[in-house]
Amino acid sequence: MQATTGQSTSHQRPNRNKQSATWCLMLGAIVSAGISPAAPQSAGAAEPVEKMADAAESVPRPPVDDNDLRRWLENMIWHHRFTVDEITAATGLAPAEIVAAQARFDVRPDNRPARAADSPLLLLPYPGGRHPRLGFRDGAVRPRRETKFSVFTPWDPTSYVVVDLPEAIWSQHGLIWLAHEHVPTVWTKQGIELPVLEWQRDGEQGLSLARKLPNGVAFTAHAVAAADAIRMELKFENGSTESFSDLRVQICAMLGHAAGFAEQTNDNKVFRDPYVACRSTDGQRWIITAWEGCQRAWANAPCPCLHSDPKFADSAPGSSQQLRGWLSFYEGNDLDAELARIEATNWRAAPAR
């Protein structure tokens, strides 16, 4: 996401995975039973499916096997409510293959398992194929899905926030990580393509991603769902032989697919460093995020999104450090009391595990 300080972000396009010719055999006979996912029900997503897929410019990631295919179909159909065209954009599979797989695994919009009322917030990897932003998409071309996860609202199972953890990391050398393409990074300037990764399950309710950069620096992201919040961590490890400074991080919470929060304005936002909150159109609900070490609390109206962007301390060779973050939902009209309640949880000291 482009910062208003004049610095902008980019990402090197990863290698395109080739769709295996064996998928037709693996998926079995094509079924013409008329099974297809429901149309997208995300807030503000009034664009035609074809336009949405075009704008996303996603690099498809074919499933690695049947288990992977089934997990992604459940993710995309049961929860994100993707259309067949959007699943094609995410996976590279042909529409007929997708329909056949839906029939084989019996994954339909109307047979999603019910969740218990006391379940943790639903936290899922974001599948790609549908752009997570409503606007300013030219500032996030070919978004990489491996740093993005969806958190579904407790009041509407079809609405979700997409968190990019991290969207970007700067150092004194420039941009060392970017989760999409926009402007050159230190790696694209050298012609280096970073490998494609995926979120890994971290316990029953968590996700984890570890990436090592070509210079020996590594970062690890964690997100864990509880009933009241998503607790997050970002760890920075300096495995290089030089010190790093000016380690600024962008962590983006995109609201365009959360009903009632998709207005492209900052008039519905509240900034109380480190807390950034967005009010729903009816004024009765809030989405709240915060990070320790916040050096800039802001929002980008066209996206729309929330930022509580932190900064790591300077990093000597061999050192490591971590920052903790928070995302939650609130129903009520006393934001001050809710922020005080969140502060009292001592979330900065609680590990995301």
Regions found by a protein language model. Name each.
Residues P109-Y126:
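Short Lys/Arg-enriched helix C-cap and helix-to-coil transition segments
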Residues A21-S36:
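Bacterial N-terminal signal peptides
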Residues H173-A226, S243, L247:
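Extended, loop-rich substrate-binding clefts of extracytoplasmic carbohydrate-active enzymes
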Residues R144-A168, G239, A253-S319, A340:
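A contiguous, surface-exposed recognition patch within enzymatic or periplasmic domains that forms
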Residues L123-V196, E204:
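Acidic-aromatic substrate-binding/catalytic surfaces of carbohydrate-active enzymes
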Residues V224-T265:
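Acidic (Asp/Glu-rich), glycine- and aromatic
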Residues H182-L194, E198-R201, T281-R353:
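Beta-strand-rich recognition/accessory modules
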Residues D66-R81:
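Short, amphipathic alpha-helical "recognition" segments used to contact nucleic acids or chromatin
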